[in-house]
Regions:
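N-terminal beta1-alpha1 ligand-phosphate binding loop
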Residues: 2-25
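Anionic-ligand binding patches
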Residues: 2-7, 29, 41-194
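Cofactor-binding loop segments of dinucleotide-utilizing enzymes, especially the Rossmann-like FAD-
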Residues: 12, 32, 114
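Flexible, glycine-rich phosphate/dinucleotide-binding loops
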Residues: 16, 36-38, 118
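Short loop/helix-cap segments at secondary-structure boundaries that form the rim of catalytic
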Residues: 18-22, 39, 61-62
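A short beta-strand-loop structural module common to alpha/beta enzyme folds
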Residues: 28-37
Length: 194
């Protein structure tokens, strides 16, 4: 498949940018400015799909052509949505909650053709189990990584692997952009990541 349309990433996330760059994708960044508020009446998957759609629509309002990619990620533990921590104390509480437990990384992805307004959406779910995390390990981890811009207060690609006992599903989803789902969505627009 040939990529004749420009790709627009509606995210300021350095992790999503890095994932696309590693594939050799050429794209522009038009970050969305929407407030990422969870709707408690919606399921986790409905929330990430809704927020990724709002981000994509926000970017689409700023440009006239191109294929817009937007994503939103959360961590879910026993039905509780863990977004980005409010502060370091909140981040520490999140990792203590995740200690020795299985949780889900869920990312909603929306692709919009800015010209035709065609929309396609998907979501990915990855199961992750953490090792037992003591306070010293959490403090050492926070010296290596700023947890405040990360759902669940960790990043698998930034020394977060040392926290993880097992993972089942898309690794790139845990980073914040499930490349398999994204490539399927882009195919609906005649575009491929590779």
């Amino acid at each position: 498949m040939k990529n004749n349309k420009k790709l627009i990433l509606a995210s300021g996330s350095p992790r999503r940018t890095e994932l696309l760059k590693r594939l050799g994708c050429k794209f522009q960044i038009v970050p969305s400015k929407i407030e990422e508020k969870i709707n408690p009446r919606l399921s986790p998957i409905q929330n990430v799909k809704r927020l990724s759609r709002l981000k994509a629509l926000d970017a689409a309002s700023k440009i006239s052509d191109g294929i817009i990619i937007a994503a939103d990620s959360i961590v879910v533990l026993n039905g509780e949505i863990l977004g980005k921590p409010k502060d370091m104390k909140d981040a520490e509480k999140m990792l203590q909650k995740l200690s020795s437990k299985e949780h889900l990384a869920i990312t909603g992805v929306t692709v919009i053709d800015a010209e035709t307004k065609k929309i396609a959406q998907s979501a990915a779910v990855t199961k992750i189990k953490f090792h037992n995390l003591n306070k010293n390990l959490i403090k050492r981890y926070f010296k290596l990584v700023n947890p405040l811009d990360k759902a669940g207060a960790y990043a698998i690609q930034e020394n977060g692997a040392m926290l993880i006992e097992s993972i089942s599903g898309s690794y790139s989803n845990v980073i914040g952009l499930p490349l398999d789902k994204l490539n399927q969505l882009l195919g609906k627009f005649g575009v491929s990541l590779m």
